[in-house]
Amino acid sequence: KLKRILYPENMLFKMIILNCGLLLLVTLVLTAAGNYIYEESIAERSYANTMEIQNQVLKSLDLIFKSVEDNVEALGNYPEVQEYLKVDAENQQASRVELERQVRDLLLDYSRIYSEYLNIVVVSEKGQYLSNDSYRVKKLPLTEEKWYQDAVLANGELVLSPTSLGRNLKAWKNYSTDNYVSTVKLICDRQTSAGIGVILIDLDLKSIQNLVEDITMGQTGFGYIQDSQGHVLYAPQNEVVYRMNPNWVTDGESGRVRCRIKGKDYNVIYSHSKYTDLTAVGVFDWGKTIEGISRARTVSKWIAVIIMIFAAGA
């Protein structure tokens, strides 16, 4: 029977076998090509839409942190703040006490106006400090803290501190470290431009949370924000996000990568902000995204099997 199919003597039978074979080949090629083109089309459309959403989110984040930077700059330029950062605490005791009162009133005013500023700390290069809502845990100078040193090294640029764990400051209201992101900036003498201290602001994450939660990436995707150190700044409740490798989204200002997590394929799309050094990341369950293509592949396989059975039976 097999020999008869492979080497038929009847011309009509030969034509049937040939036509069935060609039909099978055309079906497989067209189905594979169609699926590939459709899958690439979905990937490109997903990439373009996600990039647009992420760039809008990053622009909004830039505006939020630019506002923080402007407010820090304005606070640092107040005459009483400038004088407080330069005062000699030991030899100018009376002046120091009065300046502390004035600066503390300023900090309270700022915290009332900007309710998202959970904590504001002013630290002089001499080690003295004032805050609206925190106190020093250990009697070690805050100038030795990493966040202070980072601000000095940034030379006047706003720095986002990735974590406040281990910081020598504790808030009276006892905010969780998951509730805010710390920003620090060097304050310079208005006359000499020399650094005279640092201002730290703990920004409530709710403003960022609202932006990220508004990101809609279809039924199979979600978004999150990652800082320059690879720490997740904010993400929705999701077991996948904490299995992401930060190095996957560090190649260039934007891009995409396919990765495998817990046996599933994910399409990862990312975009980076030069101003904040933050990265917006979109993650899609690629298997669910192309379920329609998978069904089409299954149907095409069954069609091929039916054709082969028909050819063999003929």
What are these regions (language model features)?
Residues L2-E44, A48, V305, I309:
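Extreme N-terminal signal-anchor transmembrane helix of membrane signaling/transducer proteins, especially
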Residues A33, N49, E80, K301, ...:
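Signal-transducing alpha-helical linker
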Residues A48-G156:
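Extracytoplasmic/periplasmic sensory segments of membrane signal-transduction proteins
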Residues Q102-S111, S134, V198-A235, E239-V240:
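Solvent-exposed, extracytoplasmic
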Residues R112-Y114, K126-D202:
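Extracytoplasmic/periplasmic ligand-binding sensor regions of membrane-associated signaling proteins
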Residues L130-L140, L160, V232-T250:
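GAF sensory domains
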Residues V152-C188, T220-F222, R243-T276:
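Membrane-proximal, non-catalytic sensory/regulatory domains of signal-transducing membrane proteins
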Residues T279-A314:
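Cytoplasm-proximal transmembrane signaling helix
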